[in-house]
């Protein structure tokens, strides 16, 4: 059995021991329902209020502007569905990009198909970025919401969110950014650097627990709720709050965002070593941009190879990587990001390596030692399957 090399930090990260320790009292002793009026409930409510105040202080917002969610997917759903529905009397035109996470794209698909909204999906350049000029040309009198992710989960492109947000604000249009992949990977001062009205955050992307996220909602915006059953989270998100996970989220924010845990010389050097070596490999084409990109992410395609064969080959050698695409019933869907880059023939062959704080130079060299053979096997298996 080969040793395990984890190069999939954009998918999830291990829970940090200090974060786990901060969560433990909420699992063992302070386990009351924050909505209960008795002493155990009041203890839990005090912890919830303190966690919200800590998050707001760290992010640079008001506590009332922080809504705790079950993760990035719910935060995106609340931001997009809730805001579009709340503002539909003003207009039903929405703008997003062609390279959003499925948690965003599928919200826009639903609003378009089921609720009569018009959706403009902005193209991207060869580096996967949206042009501010394209956004400005897409504005209409009935545009009420723009949503563009801060950083792409598949290829690591960093969007010009501050400029996009400024363009929206100049027109009085609400701007949401999915910052799930951004936090922990790029320098952070406060939320104002996004020029956004709504910002999605997810704990397990920076050594926090799964099942915890938040949505910043700039006052006085009030999206319609998408969950019903109580007045929790200022009547914006029904359901008993997951207090241990919330405390873990806030602790991870405080420990790993400033300075960002992934934004280190070591990680950038390891990323650059991978980039230089993969660029020289036969059959590989890099698709992750080298400028304005996440410091830990390397993405490439192998035209003519099957993505599942590539991932299976890596896994057999103990290497945990990702296609960046949804996997269903043993087959990979084409990467929408690679399709948006105009590389249709290679959209099924994306491989993403995403590094983290425990990645080492030895890991990188071990991967590079076996990668050419894995690529060769994947190409040969594709040719064999096609009868060539």
Question: What does each of the following model-derived ranges do?
Answer:
Residues 1-388:
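Pyridoxal 5′-phosphate
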């Amino acid at each position: 059995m080969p040793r395990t090399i984890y190069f999939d930090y954009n998918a999830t990260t291990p829970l940090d021991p200090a974060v786990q320790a901060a969560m433990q009292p909420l699992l063992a002793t302070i386990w009351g329902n924050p909505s209960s009026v008795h002493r155990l409930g009041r203890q839990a409510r005090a912890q919830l209020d303190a966690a919200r105040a800590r998050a707001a202080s760290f992010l640079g917002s008001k506590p009332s502007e922080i809504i705790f969610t079950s993760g990035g997917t719910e935060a995106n759903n609340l931001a997009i569905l809730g805001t579009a529905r709340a503002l539909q009397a003003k207009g039903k035109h929405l703008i997003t990009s062609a390279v959003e996470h499925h948690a965003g794209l599928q919200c826009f698909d639903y609003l378009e198909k089921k609720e009569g909204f018009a959706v403009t999906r902005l193209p991207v350049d060869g580096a996967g970025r949206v042009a501010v000029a394209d956004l400005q040309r897409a504005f209409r009198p009935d545009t009420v919401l723009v949503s563009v992710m801060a950083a792409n989960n598949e290829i690591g492109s960093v969007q010009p969110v501050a400029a996009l947000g400024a363009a929206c604000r100049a027109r009085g249009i609400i701007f949401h950014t999915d910052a799930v992949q951004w936090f922990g990977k790029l320098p952070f001062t406060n939320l104002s650097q996004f020029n956004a009205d709504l910002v999605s955050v997810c704990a397990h992307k920076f050594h926090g627990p799964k099942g915890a996220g938040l949505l910043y909602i700039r006052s006085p915006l009030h999206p319609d709720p998408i969950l019903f059953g109580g007045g929790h989270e200022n009547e914006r998100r029904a359901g008993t709050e997951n207090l241990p996970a919330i405390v873990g989220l806030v602790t991870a924010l405080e420990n790993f965002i400033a300075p960002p845990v992934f934004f280190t010389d070591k990680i950038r050097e390891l990323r650059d070593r991978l980039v230089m070596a993969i660029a020289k490999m036969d059959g590989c084409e890099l698709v992750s941009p080298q400028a304005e990109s996440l410091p830990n992410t390397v993405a490439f395609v192998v035209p003519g190879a099957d993505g599942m064969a590539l991932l299976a080959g890596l896994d057999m050698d103990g290497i945990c990587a990702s296609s960046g695409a949804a996997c269903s019933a043993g087959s990979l869907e084409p990467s929408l990001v690679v399709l948006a880059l105009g590389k249709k023939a290679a959209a099924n062959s994306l491989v993403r390596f995403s590094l983290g704080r425990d990645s080492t130079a030895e890991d990188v060299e071990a991967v590079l030692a076996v990668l050419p053979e894995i690529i060769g096997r994947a190409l040969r298996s594709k040719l064999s399957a096609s009868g060539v």
